[in-house]
Amino acid sequence: GGYLASAFACQYPERIASLINLSNAPNKLPDEEVITRKKIICLVEAQGYTGITLARIKTFLDVSNHSNTLIIECIKAMDSDFGGNVLLQQLNSTTLRKNLLPQLFRLNIPMLFCFGDSDLLVNKAIIEQLAKTNACIKQQRFDHCGHMLPLEQPFLLAKALSFFIDSKLN
């Protein structure tokens, strides 16, 4: 969702008043993640989809949440609701992507990037550098959090979002 929202903002900047991006840096994915996704696509196309594995779930979570059954079961339920066809569509449409950061950097709108300190899919250094060099861009790093920010730190995320929205209104 974050990459698509960023792409929309770049394509139609006149329609966007602000941008909030959770657990996403709108740039290329790490090579390792691209390889993993391509393997998943091949496997699902060849053998069908039987659901997300615990090992894959753990790659999205901070180590402190590896045994949090509430979060793990929630991820499994979301995965089950969407199924293999939606997974394939998502992976095929979001794996190979261009770097949108230079375009976003030129937009003159308030932006907030929120990410976990142990999120393996977000290039945190790039977001932090952008926030240092562009006053429109704010970033919020969440401790003890991986890629599943809304599940791992829901209250702190709600507070950060509320603060960002309130600051835009005042």
Label every PLM stretch briefly.
Residues 29-32, 47-106:
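Conserved alpha/beta-hydrolase catalytic His-Asp/Glu region
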Residues 128-137:
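Active-site-adjacent alpha-helix of alpha/beta-hydrolase-fold enzymes
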Residues 137-170:
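Catalytic active-site module of serine/aspartate enzymes centered on a nucleophile-bearing elbow/loop
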Residues 6-54:
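Flexible "cap/lid" loop of the alpha/beta hydrolase fold
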Residues 1, 5:
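Gly/Ala-rich beta-loop-alpha elbow adjacent to hydrolase catalytic centers
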Residues 120-126:
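Conserved alpha/beta-hydrolase "acid-adjacent" motif
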Residues 107, 113-115, 119:
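Short beta-strand/loop motif that positions the catalytic acidic residue
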Residues 44, 79, 119, 146-149:
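Glycosyltransferase donor-binding loop in the core domain
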